[in-house]
Amino acid sequence: MGLEAVVNEIREKGRKEVETIRAETRTDVEEILVDAQTRAAGIKASAQEEADRAVTHIINQEASAANLVVKRQVLNAQKTLLDQVYSASLAAVGDLPAEFQEKALTALLKRAVKEIKKGVVHANERDSPVVEEILSQLKMFSGYTMGAPVDIPGGIIVESNDGELQIDYSYRTFLDEIWESGLKDASDILFT
C-alpha cells in the first residue's frame, strides 16, 4: 500500500471520527442550552423584570461556555487525529518493502555523498545491514564507514569524520518537513 493510500485512509478515518465527535458535542450543547432555558424560566416567574435580564445573561453565558467546551473538545480531537495521522504515516513509511528501503537508502547516500565525501553513516538497527551492504558494493561510498545504530524510523544520518557537519536524512526529518508545509492542507481536508 502506498503512502498516499495510507494517508487517504487515515484522513477518511479522521474525518469520520471528527463527525462522530461533532455529533456528540452537539448533543452536549443542546443539553446545556435546555438546562439554561429551564433555569431562566424559573427566574422569570418570580420576578419578570429581573428574570428578563437574568435569562438573557444566563443564556448568553451558557451558550458561550458550551461553545467554548465544544471548541476545546473539537480542537483536542483534531490534534489527536493529526497526531495519529503523523504517527501512522511515519510507521507506514518505515514498513515499506525491503526493496523500497534499499532504493531509498541508496538514493539518500548518493545525495549525502555530494555534501560529505568522507564520514560515518548511522541508520536504525533494521536498516544498518542494508546500509553496510550498499556502502561495500558501491565505490562512490568508499569514504564512508558504518556507525552505531540510532533511534530513527528509517533513513540515514551522515556525519563528517571531524564531526563538524551532520546531515539528517531520516524519514522523520522528511516527514516533518512535509508535515509542516502540508499541515494546514491536511487540517482543511480532515476537518471541513
Curated annotation (Swiss-Prot):
It is a peripheral membrane protein. One of its GO terms (cellular component) is proton-transporting two-sector ATPase complex, catalytic domain. The keyword Acetylation does not apply. InterPro entries: ATPase_E_C, ATPase_V1_Esu. Pfam families: vATP-synt_E. It is found in: Cell membrane. Gene3D superfamilies: ATP synthase, E subunit, C-terminal, F1F0 ATP synthase subunit B, membrane domain. Has multiple subunits with at least A(3), B(3), C, D, E, F, H, I and proteolipid K(x). Component of the A-type ATP synthase that produces ATP from ADP in the presence of a proton gradient across the membrane. This is A-type ATP synthase subunit E.
